[in-house]
Amino acid sequence: GSTEVYTDQWTSMYRCAAEIAGEAHTFFGLQSLAQTDAAVITVQAPGQEGSDRTGLSLPDDQLELLQQTITEAKRLHKHVVVVLNVAGPVDVTAFASDVDAILCVFFPGMEGGRAAAEILYGLVNPSGKLPLTFPAAYRDCPSFGNFPGSAGEVFYGEGIYVGYRYYEKRQIKPAYAFGYGLSYTNFMISDLQLNHDRMDADAAECVHASVRVRNIGRCTGKEVVQLYISDVESTLDKPVKELKGFEKIELAPGEEKLVRFTITRQMLESFDPEYGIWACESGLYRILVGNSSDQISCSADLRVKSRSIYDYSPRTCLKKLYDDPRSRAMLIETIHAVGLDENILADELYYRKFRPIGVVLQNLPNADPKRKEQSYQLFYQNIAKLDLTDC
């Protein structure tokens, strides 16, 4: 539930920094900035369960203090580090370009002061990744047009496009993407390999993916390797890509490790609300590996075979069947079989190309009634047998 805890078991980042660097090298307050190498300022935005923030901006008093610190630091040619003590994303555009580093600790708990101090002094190499997206502007948020709603109710219109899925679908560049996070070292992710480039999902086959990760920096650190999957051309509405796996590994300078993932049918399935089922579509999937949703280092293609409700049937739209040379040839043959010319489809393709083929065929005028039923059923049987793996 929701509660508020008052305790004397908390840590001050200032006191912990003094323990690490010594009292003589640690100063508190803006008036002491001239004696330091860098200014570290903590800003906060309240947030809690059971209520919403009115926006993404930091409180006015926090922004004012932050701006004073930045102005004075620039005058004295000092570095500025901002520690974000927040519940979720905030608008950083007002100051991000004017500071040297941002450490987002969210709500770290009673040892948060010590954890932050140890990171700032290099005793701990940060390795966290954002579990959400920091938008570049509040208006970029998926819910911007719906919040705060009316009469105490908010309409959630994002559907499946929540978080990074929304920003990628709308091609909106965020301030900091889902999965983003820096370290005191650098990593190189390369050489994505699949043990097979085809997968029969109906036979419960799995595909094993491996990728090389190398620490190309000067200190030991941890990297979170993220696996995303994209259905390149799907029938069902889907995000551009979705996170399907991740592994966190520690590497010494120059060290390289092989990170492995297993791709299963479940990773390729999406829920169809119309039919109320999880479905795995046949076709081309792209396997993507990187260290954030917008930093993809390598990719590989996987062809998947699977029988599903999206296989060719009387429900399939005319355009999809006509775009496939195999089913187009079958359709033209069927049109001829009922005594019609293929040009009769011209108007349908221009005005009603997204109609189900079953509706199109039933509405064709002057089709031979004796041949129609048998020819149509044979057509449906033949298109249902087509392998859509390579479509």
Task: State what each model feature region is.
Residues G1-C391:
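C-terminal non-catalytic regions of proteins with extracellular/luminal or membrane-system context
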